[in-house]
C-alpha cells in the first residue's frame, strides 16, 4: 500500500466513506459519487442505464458492498474520481454501516435509482461519469448488504446508470459488509471499483484482487479526467508492480473475500489492508461488458460500458472485496472502450493486472453476466465482484489469451501480479497459482482487448497452459477451504479450471461478451445466496459450494469471499463467474475432482456448484461456478466436489447443485437438457463438461437470451456444441488431468452404485445363506456338490431377479468397475445358475466388495474366489468332501452296533423279578433297621424310558449288567454301542463276559 500515492489514499478514504452506511443517503451518495465520477469523461453519458440497470446497480451495490472494502485500493486507482468519489465515499461509509442484507439491497435499489437519477442529472458524457455512476451505484447499493439486494432497475439505461451508481453504492455497502466480515483497513483510498472488489459477492474478482489490493493502482483511473488519464498511465505502471504484488497478494485478496467465510482461510484476509481493488476493477470490467438488461442479482453490479477507450487499464472498475465487502469502483473507460464487445472486459483485462489475472475479454461479458445477469444491455457494464481478476483460475484462462493477444500492459501488470501472486500462493488459491494467474491474467486481458475469439483460442491454449499453472492455485484453495484441499489438484485445477474455463472462456470468451447474459439474472432471486451467483439456483450453490467458489475464484479471493460471504460470494462465485470465478469454481470445487482438474468448465460442472456454476463457468462465470460449488468442500469434490462427481460432499451436493445451477442461472443460454443431463454426466466428466461447456458457450453466444433461470438452459444449445468441442478439447486435456477427479468421482459413483448393488445382493444372498440350506448341506454327504449348486442358487436366486440384475448390470454398464462383466465371464459351473448379475459382479470386481460380507459363508467365499472354476472345486469342494468323509468315518466308529452284534454281545430275556428273595431279605433287614422298604425299592427301571420293568417284558442286559427294555436299548445301541449308563462298549465286555 505504500506504493499508493496520496491520491490513492484519498480514494481509499473515499472508499471508506462510501463504505459508510448510507441507507437513505444513497441518492446523496450517488450524487457525491457522481460528482467524483463526473470528473471523468462521460461514461455515463456514453452508456445510460435504464431503470432496470439502476435496480441492478442497487443490487450490485448491495452485493458488492463487501467488495467495497477491497475496492478502496481500486478507488486509489480512481484518483481521477477522487474528488467526486470522496463525496461518494462518504455516502458509501454510511451505506456500509447500513449494509444489512436484502433489505439494504432494496434500499440500494431505491438509492441506485436515485443514483441513477443523479447520474442521469450528472450524466456527463464523460466515461468518468459512468464511473461516477458506478461509484454512486456502489454508494447507493452499498446501503444494501448484498450487491444484488437492491431492486433491479428496469430500463437498460437506468440499469447502466443505476448500475454505476448502484455499484458504487453497493460497493460502499458491500464494502461495509466486507469490512464487517473482514475489517480490512480502509485508510487508503479505494476506488469505487475497489469497493466493489471488497464485496465477497465479487468473490472471484475480489478474491483475485484482494490478494493484490496493492494493485489497486491499476484500477485507479476510474474517472476519465485528463488528470486521471495521466494517473492511469502512471497507475498502469504501478499496476504492473501492483499486479505482481497483487498476484503475490492475490491469495490474500481472495482470502479477504473469503475473510467473510474464514479469515484464517487464507492470507488474503490479511490483505484486507491491501484491498484488492485491482481484482475489483478487473472483475468489474469483466462484469461490465455486455450487461444484459434484466433484474440484477444482489451481487450484480452494472457499470456502464463506455465505448470510449479513454480509460486505460487503470480505469477499470475497481472492485475489491477485502472484508467480504464489495466495493465497485467506476469501470475504467479504457477497459470498456477496449473491450471489443463494448464490454469493459477486454479493457479491464488490459487495464489492470488484476484484470489480466482475471481473463476479462470474453469473460468480461460473463463477468457482467455475473454481476448483472439481468442487465443484458451491453451499454451497462456489470462489475462482477465475485470474480477476482487475480483469480488464478481466471488467470489461467487469460494466460492463453494473453499469449494470443499478449497485451503488454496487461501482461506486464499480470506478470508483476504473478510475482506477487506467487508470494501469496499460500494465502489463497490464487496465491497458489499466482504466477500462472498473473500470466494468464495478462493474457486474458490482452485477449479481452484483442477480441473474444482470440481470447477463446488463447483460452483454449490457456486451458492447457493454465492447467499446469493451475496447481499453484490449489494452495490458495486449500487455504480458503480444506474442502478444496482434496482438490489440491483441483485447486491447481483452478488453473485447470481456468483452463477448462479457459476453454469455456474460449467458448464463452467470445460469447461471454454476449454471454454476459447474466445467466445470473435469476441470481438476483438469491441475493443472499452465499456466493451463489445464481439466485435461481441458490440452493444449488450451498455454502459448501461457496467455499468451493472461493477456490473457484481463480484468485482464491473469490473463493474465500464466497466462503466468507455467501451472499457476497454469490457474485463472486456466480456473478463473477467471470473467467476467474468460473475457473475458481471449477478448480476449487472440492467436489469436482474434475473441476479441480481443469475440467474447469467440466470441473465445475462436475464440481460443487458445478451444475449452476459449470454453466456459469462455461458462460464465463468462473466465479459463478465456483460460488455454486460448494461441494467445495469436501470436498468434496469441488467441483467435484466434486461437483460432477460431487458425490463427494460437495460432489454429491454439488452435482445436483451444479446441474441445477447450470439449469438455473448459468444455463440461461444453454439448452436445459444439457444442464439436466450433466447430473449424471457430471461424473462423466467429458460429456457433462461438454454439455456444460456447450451450455456456457451457448450462454456466451446467446447471453442476450438471458432467459429466466429456467430458460437460461435452453438459450443456446447449438452454439454450445460448437464451443463444446473446443471447450471440450481443452477440457479433454484437462480432463486427463481432471480424469483422476473425473474418474475419481466417476469411480465414486461407480463404487457407490456397486456398493448399493452389492448390499442388495448381499442382503438377499446373505439371507439366503442365513436361511442356510447351504450349511445344512454340510451334513449331507454330497455337501460339496450340493453346496456348489446351492450357493449359485442362493447367489443367483436374487441375481436372477430382473430388477436387481438390471440395476446391478446397469450400474456396471454405467461405468461400474464391474462393467467388464459379461455372462460369458461366469464360471461354467455358475453360468447355468443365472448368477450372472451377482456372481458376475463378484467375479468382476464387485466380488472383492462382496467377499467381506460373504466371509461368513465359506461356500460363497470359495465360489467367489474360484469363479474361474479352478479354486472352486479344489479348495472349497475338496475340503468339504474330506470333512464329510471324516464325519462319515467318525460316524461309523460311533454309529453303534449292528443288530447281530447287539444280539451277540447282550443278553436278551424276559424280565422276571428274580430278586424277590433278595428283596424280601433286604426288606427284612431294613425292617430290622427300622426302615421300611417298599416294593419300589425292589423294582428296576429302564433308564432309557424310565419305566419300571414289568414281569415278562423283553429286556436286554448289557455286558455291564445294566438292564433295559430291548426296544429301548436296541435303538440306542444302533446309534451307539456303548451302555447309556456307564458308557462301556458292549463289545469290550464280551471277552470278559464270555
UniProtKB/Swiss-Prot annotation:
A zinc finger (RING-type) spans 942-983. The gene is RNF111. The lineage of its organism: Eukaryota, Metazoa, Chordata, Craniata, Vertebrata. A motif (SUMO interaction motif 2 (SIM)) lies at residues 325-331. A motif (SUMO interaction motif 1 (SIM)) lies at residues 300-304. Binds free ubiquitin non-covalently via its RING-type zinc finger. Ubiquitin-binding leads to enhance the E3 ubiquitin-protein ligase activity by stabilizing the ubiquitin-conjugating enzyme E2 (donor ubiquitin) in the 'closed' conformation and activating ubiquitin transfer. Residues 241-404 are annotated as: Interaction with AXIN1. GO terms for biological process: global genome nucleotide-excision repair; pattern specification process; positive regulation of protein ubiquitination; positive regulation of transforming growth factor beta receptor signaling pathway; protein polyubiquitination; protein ubiquitination; ubiquitin-dependent protein catabolic process. This is E3 ubiquitin-protein ligase Arkadia.
Amino acid at each position: 500500500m505504500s506504493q499508493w500515492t496520496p491520491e490513492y489514499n484519498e480514494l481509499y478514504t473515499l472508499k471508506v466513506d462510501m463504505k459508510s452506511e448510507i441507507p437513505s443517503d444513497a441518492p446523496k451518495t450517488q450524487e457525491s459519487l457522481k460528482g467524483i465520477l463526473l470528473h471523468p469523461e462521460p461514461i455515463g453519458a456514453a452508456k445510460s442505464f435504464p431503470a432496470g440497470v439502476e435496480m441492478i446497480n442497487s443490487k450490485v451495490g448491495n452485493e458488492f458492498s463487501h467488495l467495497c472494502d477491497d475496492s478502496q485500493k481500486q478507488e486509489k486507482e480512481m484518483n481521477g474520481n477522487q474528488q467526486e468519489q470522496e463525496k461518494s465515499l462518504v455516502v458509501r461509509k454510511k451505506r456500509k454501516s447500513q449494509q444489512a442484507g436484502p433489505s439494504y439491497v432494496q434500499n440500494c435499489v431505491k438509492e441506485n435509482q436515485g443514483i441513477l437519477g443523479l447520474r442521469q442529472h450528472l450524466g456527463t458524457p464523460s466515461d468518468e461519469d459512468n464511473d461516477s455512476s458506478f461509484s454512486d451505484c456502489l454508494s447507493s447499493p452499498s446501503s444494501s448488504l448484498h450487491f444484488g439486494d437492491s431492486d433491479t432497475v428496469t430500463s437498460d439505461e437506468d440499469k447502466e446508470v443505476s448500475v454505476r451508481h448502484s455499484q458504487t453504492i453497493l460497493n460502499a455497502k458491500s464494502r461495509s459488509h466486507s469490512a464487517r466480515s473482514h475489517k480490512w483497513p480502509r485508510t487508503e483510498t479505494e476506488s469505487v471499483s475497489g469497493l466493489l472488489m471488497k464485496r465477497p459477492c465479487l468473490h472471484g474478482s475480489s478474491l483475485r484482487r484482494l490478494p493484490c489490493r496493492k494493485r489497486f493502482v491499476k484500477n485507479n483511473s476510474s474517472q476519465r479526467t485528463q488528470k486521471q488519464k495521466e494517473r492511469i498511465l502512471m497507475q498502469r505502471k504501478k499496476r504492473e508492480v501492483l499486479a505482481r504484488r497483487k498476484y503475490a497478494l492475490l491469495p490474500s485478496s481472495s482470502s479477504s473475500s473469503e475473510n467473510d467465510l474464514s479469515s484464517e482461510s487464507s492470507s488474503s484476509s490479511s490483505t484486507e489492508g491491501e484491498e484488492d481493488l485491482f481484482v475489483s476493477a478487473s472483475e468489474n470490467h469483466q462484469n461490465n461488458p455486455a450487461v444484459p438488461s434484466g433484474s440484477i442479482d444482489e451481487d450484480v453490479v452494472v457499470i456502464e460500458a463506455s465505448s470510449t477507450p479513454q480509460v486505460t487499464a487503470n480505469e477499470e472498475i475497481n472492485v475489491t472485496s477485502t472484508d467480504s465487502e464489495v466495493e465497485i469502483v467506476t469501470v475504467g473507460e479504457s477497459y470498456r472502450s477496449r473491450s471489443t464487445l463494448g464490454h469493459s472486459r477486454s479493457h479491464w483485462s488490459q487495464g489492470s493486472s488484476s484484470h489480466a489475472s482475471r481473463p476479462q475479454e470474453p469473460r468480461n461479458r460473463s463477468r457482467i453476466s455475473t454481476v448483472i445477469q439481468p442487465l443484458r444491455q451491453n451499454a451497462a457494464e456489470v462489475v462482477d465482484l465475485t470474480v477476482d481478476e487475480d483469480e488464478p483460475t481466471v488467470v489461467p484462462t487469460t494466460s492463453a489469451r494473453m499469449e494470443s493477444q499478449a497485451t503488454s500492459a496487461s501482461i506486464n501488470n499480470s506478470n508483476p501480479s504473478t510475482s506477487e501472486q506467487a508470494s501469496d500462493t499460500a494465502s489463497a488459491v490464487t496465491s497458489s497459482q499466482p504466477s500462472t494467474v498473473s500470466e494468464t491474467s495478462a493474457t486474458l486481458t490482452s485477449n479481452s482487448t484483442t477480441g473474444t475469439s482470440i481470447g477463446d483460442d488463447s483460452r483454449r491454449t490457456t486451458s492447457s497452459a493454465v492447467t499446469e499453472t493451475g496447481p499453484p492455485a490449489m494452495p490458495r484453495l486449500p487455504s480458503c477451504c480444506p474442502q478444496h484441499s482434496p482438490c489440491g489438484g483441483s485447486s491447481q485445477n483452478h488453473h485447470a479450471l481456468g483452463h477448462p474455463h479457459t476453454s469455456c472462456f474460449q467458448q464463452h470468451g467470445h460469447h461471454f461478451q454476449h454471454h454476459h447474459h447474466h445467466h445470473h439474472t435469476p441470481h438476483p432471486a438469491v441475493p443472499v445466496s452465499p456466493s451463489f451467483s445464481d439466485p435461481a439456483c441458490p440452493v444449488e450453490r450451498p455454502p459448501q459450494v461457496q467455499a468451493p467458489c472461493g477456490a473457484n475464484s481463480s484468485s482464491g479471493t473469490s473463493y474465500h469471499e464466497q466462503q466468507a460471504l455467501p451472499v457476497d460470494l454469490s457474485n463472486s462465485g456466480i456473478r463473477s463467474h467471470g473467467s476467474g470465478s468460473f475457473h475458481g469454481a471449477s478448480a476449487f470445487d472440492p467436489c469436482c475432482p474434475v473441476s479441480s482438474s481443469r475440467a474447469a468448465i467440466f470441473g465445475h460442472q462436475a464440481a460443487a456448484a458445478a451444475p449452476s456454476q459449470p454453466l456459469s463457468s462455461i458462460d464465463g462465470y468462473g466465479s459463478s461456478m465456483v460460488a455454486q460449488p460448494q461441494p467445495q468442500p469436501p470436498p468434496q469434490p469441488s467441483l467435484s466436489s466434486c461437483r460432477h462427481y460431487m458425490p463427494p460432499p460437495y460432489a454429491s451436493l454439488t452435482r445436483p447443485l451444479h446441474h441445477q445451477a447450470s439449469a438455473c442461472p448459468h444455463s440461461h443460454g444453454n439448452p436445459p437438457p444439457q444442464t439436466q443431463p450433466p447430473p449424471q454426466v457430471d461424473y462423466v466428466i467429458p460429456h457433462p463438461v461438454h454439455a456444460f461447456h456447450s451450455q456456457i458457450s451457448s450462454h456466451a453466444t446467446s447471453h442476450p437470451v438471458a432467459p429466466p433461470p429456467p430458460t437460461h438452459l435452453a438459450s443456446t444449445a447449438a452454439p454450445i456444441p460448437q464451443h463444446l468441442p473446443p471447450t471440450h478439447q481443452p477440457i479433454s486435456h484437462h480432463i486427463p488431468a481432471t480424469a483422476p477427479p473425473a474418474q475419481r468421482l466417476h469411480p465414486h459413483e461407480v463404487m457407490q452404485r456397486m456398493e448399493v448393488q452389492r448390499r442388495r445382493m448381499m442382503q438377499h444372498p446373505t439371507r439366503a445363506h442365513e436361511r442356510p440350506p447351504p450349511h445344512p448341506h454340510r451334513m449331507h454327504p454330497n455337501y460339496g456338490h450340493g453346496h456348489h449348486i446351492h450357493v449359485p442358487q442362493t447367489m443367483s436366486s436374487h441375481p436372477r431377479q430382473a430388477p436387481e440384475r438390471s440395476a446391478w448390470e446397469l450400474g456396471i454398464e454405467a461405468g461400474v468397475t464391474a462393467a467388464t462383466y459379461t455372462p460369458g465371464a461366469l464360471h461354467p459351473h455358475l453360468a447355468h445358475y443365472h448368477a450372472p448379475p451377482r456372481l458376475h459382479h463378484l467375479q468382476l470386481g464387485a466380488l472383492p466388495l462382496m467377499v467381506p460380507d460373504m466371509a461368513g459363508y465359506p461356500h460363497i467365499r470359495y465360489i467367489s474366489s474360484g469363479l474361474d472354476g479352478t479354486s472352486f472345486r479344489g479348495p472349497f469342494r475338496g475340503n468339504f468332501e474330506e470333512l464329510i468323509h471324516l464325519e462319515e468315518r467318525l460316524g461309523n466308529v460311533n454309529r453303534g452296533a449292528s443288530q447281530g452284534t447287539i444280539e451277540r454281545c447282550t443278553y436278551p430275556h424276559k424280565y422276571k423279578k428274580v430278586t424277590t428273595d433278595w428283596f424280601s431279605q433286604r426288606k427284612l433287614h431294613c425292617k430290622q433297621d427300622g426302615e421300611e422298604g417298599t416294593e419300589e425299592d425292589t423294582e428296576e427301571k429302564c433308564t432309557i424310558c424310565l419305566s419300571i420293568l414289568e414281569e415278562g417284558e423283553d429286556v436286554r442286559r448289557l455286558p455291564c449288567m445294566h438292564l433295559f427294555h430291548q426296544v429301548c436299548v436296541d435303538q440306542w445301541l444302533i446309534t451307539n454301542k456303548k451302555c447309556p449308563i456307564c458308557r462301556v462298549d458292549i463289545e469290550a465286555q464280551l471277552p470278559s463276559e464270555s
